[in-house]
């Protein structure tokens, strides 16, 4: 399955026509790397779309202050489990796992890796934090029972690049 990542999509409000237009016109399923509350508040943009909401267990209902401290501005709150489930029930979206705390899995012990990769309930889809993985990470993800795992195609991550919002995920398992 081709899946396009809606990266840093914290601003899909009604005034942000550029982002909304990109979502409306995207012909592929969309993966949300973390699900900001603005997605829930402006969920009309999901009508007729499908995809995966990749959640980080420790940050559901919290903000993104954990990510690149002092480098990335705190955007807003992530959705709660209830909000994510409501959108999954209403639209053609699934819940995928993005670890508990979003660590670089290539830099943690195998014990911590297994803890981070293990979701709170069975899920079919996994996204590697920061897009990083190695053989040990691949093995742990496979042993956790995921059917598909995705890594962001890093490419250019310049916010002035028109492809900044959407980066293609690639399945690895």
Task: Give, region by region, the residue ranges found by the protein language model.
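Residues that flank catalytic or metal-binding motifs in active/ligand-binding sites
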Residues: 49, 91, 101, 145, ...
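Active-site beta->alpha N-cap acidic-glycine motif
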Residues: 2-91
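Histidine/lysine/aspartate-rich catalytic loop segments that bind and position anionic ligands
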Residues: 79-115
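Short, catalytically relevant binding-site loops at active-site mouths
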Residues: 58-61, 101-103, 133
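Proline- and acidic/polar-enriched loop/turn elements at helix boundaries
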Residues: 56, 100, 153-154
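C-terminal active-site subregion of NodB/CE4 polysaccharide deacetylases
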Residues: 1-32, 36-43, 107-173
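Hydrophobic residues in well-ordered beta-strands that form the structural core
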Residues: 53, 95-97, 150-151
């Amino acid at each position: 399955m081709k899946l396009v990542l809606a990266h840093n999509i914290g601003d899909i409000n009604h005034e942000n026509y550029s982002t909304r237009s990109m979502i409306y016109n995207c012909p592929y399923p969309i993966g949300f790397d973390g699900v900001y509350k603005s997605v829930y508040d402006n969920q009309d943009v999901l009508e007729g779309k499908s995809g995966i909401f990749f959640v980080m267990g420790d940050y559901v209902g919290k903000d993104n202050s954990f990510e690149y401290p002092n480098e990335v501005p705190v955007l807003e709150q992530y959705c709660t489990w209830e909000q994510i489930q409501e959108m999954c029930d209403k639209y053609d979206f699934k819940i995928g796992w993005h670890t508990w705390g979003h660590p670089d899995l290539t830099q943690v012990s195998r014990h911590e890796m297994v803890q981070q990769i293990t979701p709170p309930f069975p899920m079919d889809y996994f996204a590697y934090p920061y897009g990083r993985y190695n053989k040990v990470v691949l093995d742990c993800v496979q042993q956790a029972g995921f059917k598909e795992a995705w890594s962001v195609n890093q490419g250019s991550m310049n916010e002035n690049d028109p492809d900044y919002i959407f980066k293609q995920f690639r399945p690895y398992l």
